[in-house]
From Swiss-Prot:
Active site, UniProt feature: Y165, K169
Use of this protein: Diterpenoid pyrones display various biological activities and higginsianin A shows anti-HIV activity.
Keywords for this protein: NADP, Oxidoreductase
Any Pfam family the entry gives: adh_short
PROSITE patterns: ADH_SHORT
MF-aspect GO terms: oxidoreductase activity
One GO term of the biological process aspect: terpenoid biosynthetic process
Protein name: Short chain dehydrogenase/reductase dpchG
Top enzyme class: oxidoreductase
Record gene name: dpchG
Length: 268
């Protein structure tokens, strides 16, 4: 990408935070933002994956910083934003990408520990991150910023995951709309991507310890009946880049954008 192409995106020199940025969609978004000339901070709980991503992406444009952090820990999130402020000043873009899957457990069978963990990562963490991001964005002489929440078809449907994941993504939609409604007039946009089936993620790792047999069977029946087309993480990353800084996207706020080849038009 040439210098003029970088500048045309509007992200050159801007500071972006991508959670879960060391793998899957997060890494693809990180690469796209770096190519646009941004300062990108990634946080991930997987230290080995961070090390591998740094080695892979450090030669690209922009400025890459990586932090190993547990986004469910308030003190670690606070330390993360202190680090960003010390290195770059204020934040321009937050991508709430990090998430965990449940085991397809329905409400009658779910264990409270699993519920608490899924909600902590998928909903409470984005709340905390958005809280500190908004404060940083508002501290600019001319307040501005963009928050992108990575949701799912499970945010609008009931049978694409278990109870915990479904509830967490429905909640993320509410967080998106509330943030957009209150802070839009102050210059901060917040939107959610309603994701379909992606290739290039680590979602399969969620089921290494097994899953709820009947719950998974119900989901598989839906998938086999409708056979959704998959999306590539690089294509989704391009949408995040446009949403963060592309021409005309500055008017988009509080939107739920389906990035799923029409999947949610069938099941959502």
């Amino acid at each position: 990408m040439t210098s003029s192409e970088k500048n045309s995106t509007g992200l050159a020199g801007k500071t972006c935070l991508v959670t879960g940025g060391a793998g899957g969609l997060g890494k693809a978004v990180t690469a796209a933002f770096l190519d646009a000339g941004a300062n990108v901070v990634i946080c991930d709980i997987n230290a080995k994956r961070i090390e591998s991503t740094l080695a892979e992406l450090r030669t690209r444009g922009g400025n890459l910083t990586a932090v190993t952090a547990d986004i469910t820990d308030h003190d670690q999130v606070l330390s993360l934003f202190d680090d960003i402020a010390g290195r770059f000043g204020t934040l321009d873009v937050l991508v709430n990408n990090a998430a965990v899957m449940d085991r397809f457990d329905p409400v009658g069978d779910i264990e409270l520990d699993l519920w608490d963990n899924v909600l902590a990562v998928n909903l409470t963490a984005p709340l905390q991150l958005s809280k500190f991001a908004v404060r940083s964005m508002l501290s600019k002489p001319e307040p501005a910023g963009c928050i992108i929440n990575i949701a799912s078809g499970a945010a609008t449907a009931g049978w694409l995951a278990g109870t915990a994941y479904t509830a967490s993504k429905h909640g993320l939609v509410g967080l998106t709309k509330s943030t957009a409604a209150f802070y839009g007039p102050k210059g901060i946009r917040c939107n959610a991507l309603i994701m379909g089936v992606m290739v290039g993620t680590h979602m399969h790792e969620a089921f290494l310890d097994g899953c709820h047999k009947e719950g998974r069977q119900k989901v598989e029946e839906i998938f086999s009946g409708h056979r959704p087309q998959t999306c590539k993480v690089d294509d989704v990353a391009g949408i995040c880049l446009s949403l963060a800084s592309g021409p005309g996207w500055g008017t988009v706020n509080g939107a739920l954008i389906a990035v799923d080849n029409g999947w949610t038009s069938v099941v959502g």
